[in-house]
């Protein structure tokens, strides 16, 4: 059940994407007390397909999905990119792991300096583009969830969100980790042809740092090691361009 203002805004977003033939859930019904019923997407979540045999999807189909977002998305309210809050997230992580303060300060400085002066962007964006939101089938993208975050921004923000999430997956065995590295090695060069490679990595690192707050907040049994691995991933992204 959604508050009235949020309900109307969410309904309008679904209607906008339906009219543009974006493969997102369709509105199956609404109630007077603001319940919204959506159709189920076909295919499988990318988060599962990543670890199944075969190619889950192509990088081109991921970019193509974002290209289907209609220009009217840019008329919606703007959401701040993760990189604007990198100092905040660095402080949160450092509060849990004080010995990482210097590394985090360095990363925040490089990200902020590297992205300073870039315009906000006026491209249609999803706003939270990661493997849990994307559905795939037969090696192609077939749907996208959680469209309430759509709005204007930079394409690099969406692609960076996906790269960051894939770079920080936890609880993988060695074969799964190898597969993830291979997927990233195949996808990122395609993303680099669409957005600036330096911007992509800096924004990816910023998203990764925001994800580094998760293990401590959820009190994972091995939260320290998990947090450190995410910090390492963020630093590796930065070191590719710094």
Describe the residue ranges of each PLM region.
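Active-site activation/catalytic loop segments of kinase-like enzymes and analogous catalytic loops
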Residues: 156-192, 206-223
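ATP-binding pocket architecture of kinase catalytic cores
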Residues: 1-80
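Feature representing long, continuous alpha-helical segments
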Residues: 25, 36, 60, 64, ...
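Short, contiguous acidic/charged loop-to-helix segments that flank catalytic cores in large enzymes
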Residues: 1-5, 50-57, 119-121, 147-153, ...
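Regulatory N- and C-terminal appendages and interdomain linkers associated
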Residues: 9-12, 32-33, 98-106, 215-242
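Active-site acidic catalytic loop and adjacent metal/ATP-binding pocket
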Residues: 36, 114-157
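An alpha-helical support segment within catalytic cores of ATP-dependent transferases
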Residues: 74-126, 193
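Rossmann-like AdoMet/SAM-dependent catalytic core
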Residues: 198-205
């Amino acid at each position: 059940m959604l508050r009235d203002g949020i309900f109307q805004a969410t309904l309008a977003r679904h209607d906008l994407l339906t009219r543009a033939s974006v493969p997102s859930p369709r509105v199956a019904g609404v109630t007077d007390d603001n319940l919204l019923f959506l159709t189920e997407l076909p295919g499988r979540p990318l988060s599962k397909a990543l670890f199944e045999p075969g190619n889950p999807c192509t990088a081109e189909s991921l970019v193509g999905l974002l290209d289907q977002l209609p220009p009217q998305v840019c008329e919606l309210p703007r959401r701040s990119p993760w990189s604007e809050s990198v100092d905040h997230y660095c402080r949160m992580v450092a509060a849990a792991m004080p010995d990482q303060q210097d590394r985090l300060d360095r990363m925040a400085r490089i990200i902020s300096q590297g992205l300073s002066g870039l315009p906000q962007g006026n491209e249609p964006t999803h706003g939270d583009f990661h493997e849990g939101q994307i559905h795939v089938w037969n090696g192609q993208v077939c749907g996208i969830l959680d469209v309430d975050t759509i709005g204007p921004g930079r394409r690099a923000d969406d692609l960076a969100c996906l790269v960051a999430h894939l770079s920080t997956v936890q609880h993988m065995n060695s074969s799964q980790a190898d597969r993830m590295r291979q997927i990233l090695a195949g996808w990122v060069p395609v993303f680099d042809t669409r957005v600036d490679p330096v911007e992509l990595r800096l924004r990816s690192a910023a998203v990764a740092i925001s994800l580094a707050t998760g293990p401590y907040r959820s009190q994972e049994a091995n939260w320290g090691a998990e947090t450190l691995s995410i910090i390492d991933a963020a630093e590796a992204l930065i070191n590719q361009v710094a």
